[in-house]
């Protein structure tokens, strides 16, 4: 993901004010001769997506995936024996999390779970407000699959509280089996970077050693 704190990921700091953290980080890279080659989004562009191929592999979920040929950001999984609390424990273990924010009743049984894209405004799909006052957005599509495709739970990347998360909270309070596991963007996709250390040697051979070094959970919990 971006190295220097901006979405366009400029190779330098361009905000017009001094950033001491940027300066110190860059100085360390220069001091130790470290080159940063940001290949994350290129790996997303693989077919199939190289990041989520790795996530699914290292979660051990290949056997549970359904509708694998479905286009778009959503990946579906069906589990024979899964609950909200079991999913919490599994994600914490496999993703090496310090904790997890979730919505749902711990004992509720989950059958169909969807790994979805980032739930942010104006991402993936956006249209201006129509004449009837409706503005289409990706979060609305996620609500649709939970309503129409019997999706019990989602695992998103980035989230905001006022769209899908509020829908799921309301659903749970109304007695429905719905859940969300907010593991965080970096935590969700880091296993995909681990997978990169598997396929890069297949491309370049053994000429250059390849190692996966996890950055760890960005968050702490009390």
Predicted regions and their residues:
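Active-site catalytic microenvironments in core metabolic enzymes, especially phosphate/sugar-handling
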Residues: 1-222
């Amino acid at each position: 993901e971006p190295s220097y704190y901006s979405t366009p990921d400029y190779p330098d700091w361009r905000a017009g004010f001094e950033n001491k953290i940027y300066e110190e980080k860059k100085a360390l890279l220069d001091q130790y001769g470290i080159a940063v080659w940001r290949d994350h989004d290129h790996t997303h562009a693989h077919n199939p997506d190289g990041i989520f191929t790795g996530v699914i592999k290292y979660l051990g979920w290949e056997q549970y995936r359904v509708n694998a040929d479905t286009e778009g950001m959503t990946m579906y999984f069906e589990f024979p024996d899964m609950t909200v609390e079991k999913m919490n424990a599994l994600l914490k273990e496999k993703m090496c999390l310090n904790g997890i924010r979730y919505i749902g009743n711990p004992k509720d049984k989950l059958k169909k779970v969807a790994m979805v894209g980032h739930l942010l405004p104006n991402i993936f799909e956006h249209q201006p407000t129509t004449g009837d006052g409706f503005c289409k957005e990706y979060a609305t599509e996620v609500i649709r699959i939970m309503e129409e495709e019997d999706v019990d739970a989602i695992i998103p990347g980035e989230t905001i509280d006022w769209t899908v998360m509020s829908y799921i909270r309301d659903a749970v309070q109304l007695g429905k089996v719905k859940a969300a596991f907010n593991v965080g963007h970096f935590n969700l996709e880091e296993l995909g970077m681990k997978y990169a250390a598997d396929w890069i040697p297949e491309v370049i051979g053994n000429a250059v050693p390849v190692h996966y070094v996890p950055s760890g959970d960005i968050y702490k919990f009390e």
